[in-house]
């Protein structure tokens, strides 16, 4: 019984996402869900993929990357271009989407590997600067390529997949992303990755190939960022490089930090909340006030950092820590049983 409970607990995120997918699929097939709702579901799925993939680097590897939007940009433009090229022969079919996802993800992973080889020898602020620069370079290069290739400053016009089923594909890819990341992190390789985060020098002394593991994590993270970009291109009529600036990388980072570093479930929850918040802010902050949206995320990030590091808040953090609250509740229940 305990083993079954632990199995359910360890796979709770799969169960919840699968249940959500089945519920909204039935709602969609019966015509009880509108297009605005499916658009929101698509955005949530993309945000979860981006947050959990960046969480591998920031939360489990312990390295700060600010170029996640750059890898997403690669996937978005390649996915859109491949879809445009295949549309005359395959149409807007699952085959077209499948090919676009594979190619977009693999090319983003290759760029992640190329950038990772020299960059991952750096640490902390230096790595953050390099990845931030990479994201801006990708965005600028794509924007200045000939219009016939990726649309130039006007952006790349993309074909639209069947809107009724895109959110289903998106959540299937979410499950694939979670399965890949969680299986890796629960294996011996995941323990090696965590040891690098905790103490890189000690990990090296134990014979762990630090560079190899860093490169593997960075490459997998880039792969799923590319997939997120491909999905994004299918939700837009035109992909523009301005959508992938450093502000978007910061927004993804806020999801990871808000959910808790090293917590996949936390990243899922935070990505969902931030996406809903985005939709609300876009309706509330219009015109000149739209710039305040990025300021809002900066304030959230600052408050989280202060909360996690301020010595004066340590008693409060320990008192209301979720693990401590659960442990205290279990202790109270055990005490009650002993009294009875």
Predicted regions and their residues:
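Transmembrane alpha-helices and adjacent helix-loop boundaries
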Residues: 1-340
């Amino acid at each position: 019984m305990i083993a079954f409970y632990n199995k359910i607990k360890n796979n709770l995120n799969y169960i919840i996402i699968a249940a959500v997918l089945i519920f909204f699929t039935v709602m969609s097939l019966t015509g009880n869900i509108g297009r605005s709702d499916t658009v929101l579901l698509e955005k949530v799925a993309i945000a979860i993929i981006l947050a959990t993939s960046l969480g591998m680097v920031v939360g489990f590897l312990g390295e700060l990357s600010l170029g996640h939007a750059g890898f997403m940009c690669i996937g978005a433009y390649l996915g859109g271009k491949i879809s445009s090229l295949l549309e005359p022969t395959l149409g807007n079919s699952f085959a077209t989407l499948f090919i676009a996802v594979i190619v977009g993800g693999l090319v983003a992973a290759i760029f992640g590997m190329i950038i990772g080889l020299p960059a991952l020898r750096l640490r902390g602020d230096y790595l953050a600067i390099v990845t931030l620069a990479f994201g801006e370079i990708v965005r600028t290069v794509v924007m200045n390529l000939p219009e016939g290739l990726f649309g130039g400053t006007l952006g790349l016009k993309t074909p639209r997949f069947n809107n009724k089923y895109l959110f289903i594909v998106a959540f299937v890819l979410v499950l694939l992303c979670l399965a890949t990341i969680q299986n890796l992190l629960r294996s011996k390789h995941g323990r090696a990755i965590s040891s690098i985060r905790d103490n890189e020098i000690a990990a090296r002394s134990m014979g762990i190939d630090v560079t190899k593991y860093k490169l593997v994590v960075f490459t997998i993270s880039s792969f799923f960022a590319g997939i997120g970009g491909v999905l994004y291109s299918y939700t837009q009529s035109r992909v523009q490089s301005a959508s992938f600036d450093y502000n978007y990388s910061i927004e993804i980072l806020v999801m990871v930090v808000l959910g808790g570093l090293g917590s996949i479930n936390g990243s899922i929850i935070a990505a969902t909340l931030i996406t809903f918040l985005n939709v609300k802010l876009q309706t509330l902050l219009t015109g000149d006030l739209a710039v305040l949206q990025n300021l809002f995320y900066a304030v959230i990030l600052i408050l989280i950092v202060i909360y996690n590091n301020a010595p004066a808040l340590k008693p409060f953090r320990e008192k209301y820590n979720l693990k401590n609250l659960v442990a205290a509740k279990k202790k109270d229940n055990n005490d009650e049983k002993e009294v009875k």
